[in-house]
Amino acid sequence: MKGLILVGGYGTRLRPLTLTVPKPLVEFGNRPMILHQIEALAAAGVTDIVLAVNYRPEVMVETLKKYEDEFGVSITFSVETEPLGTAGPLKLAESVLKKDNSPFFVLNSDVICDYPFKELADFHQAHGGKGTIVATKVDEPSKYGVIVHDIATPNLIDRFVEKPVEFVGNRINAGLYILNPEVIDLIDLKPTSIEKETFPILVEQKSLYSFDLEGYWMDVGQPKDFLSGTVLYLNSLSKRDPAKLAKGENIVGNVLVDPTAKISPTAKVGPDVVIGPNVVIGDGVRITRSVALSNSHIKDHALVKSTIIGWNSTVGKWARLEGVTVLGDDVEVKDEIYINGGKVLPHKSISVNVPKEAIIM
């Protein structure tokens, strides 16, 4: 089987982290975001994976080619000279995706969930249609494009309603699909949208179905959702592989800690925290609902809440960070500084308080 991951472009919503590395290589749960997807595809029997990229492909190649042997897959890069939307990349990768008659998976690189690829493939084969969309239930469907089903046929999609005013359903497109190769014949090699241009054709042909996703789902393409997704991911990990989570008197709730990190016994870590490689956490530190990326240092008695601390960054003594603050690479926050919702670009030194949301350039 085959899979295509829509990697896309600049990752502007996740800046300042994506000023240093492409978004799929930002560590989520202490490994590059895209690796969660590659591993799940490989586990479902996928042997050929195409990454559709249009930004810094050389960095992606250098980082990801080494995982081919580990997961037993072939990883190829389909490089767009201009952004091709969500359907164009399928046409560009036609030679790989149509190399045999088996269906192929398509997924957005921002999506984190317990990927149900094996079950999805079985469901797709059973209904005999040309495409299947993974659907997830949401509390506020009015923000999304909602899937409406055919009354007579279970799971057959009748139409999509964009941001409905009245309740028509609560299932939305989760950004994961399985499609038959002939779907590529419906796509032109130009910037096109699979959601707006390709799927409506399949709906008209009564050949597009939806598969309900069980468990958590999150598009982690921006900082607040990255942190919310981390909470959901750690909760899922606590159920399916609890041995991976940290234990100890100073650990509260679900916490993932790289073995090379050094945490003071008087620090209190958690709940919902990820600590990366070579991170140092000083005496009396309190950190909750946050991510500390590799080689960062949180000094004594700092308070860190709802924050992403970038690689090689330092948080000073008695500093306080909260409100979805994001530090880019190699940022220094001086002692006793308060930052509330600041987005700090790489290589900055912060010596004055940032009391409300701001971009520090």
From Swiss-Prot:
Predominant location: cytoplasm
SUPFAM superfamilies xrefs: Nucleotide-diphospho-sugar transferases
E.C. designation(s): 2.7.7.13
Key words of the record: Cell cycle, Cytoplasm, GTP-binding, Nucleotide-binding, Nucleotidyltransferase, Transferase
Record GO terms (molecular function): GTP binding; mannose-1-phosphate guanylyltransferase (GTP) activity
PROSITE patterns: HEXAPEP_TRANSFERASES (PS00101)
Function: Involved in cell wall synthesis where it is required for glycosylation. Involved in cell cycle progression through cell-size checkpoint.
Stated name of the protein: Mannose-1-phosphate guanyltransferase
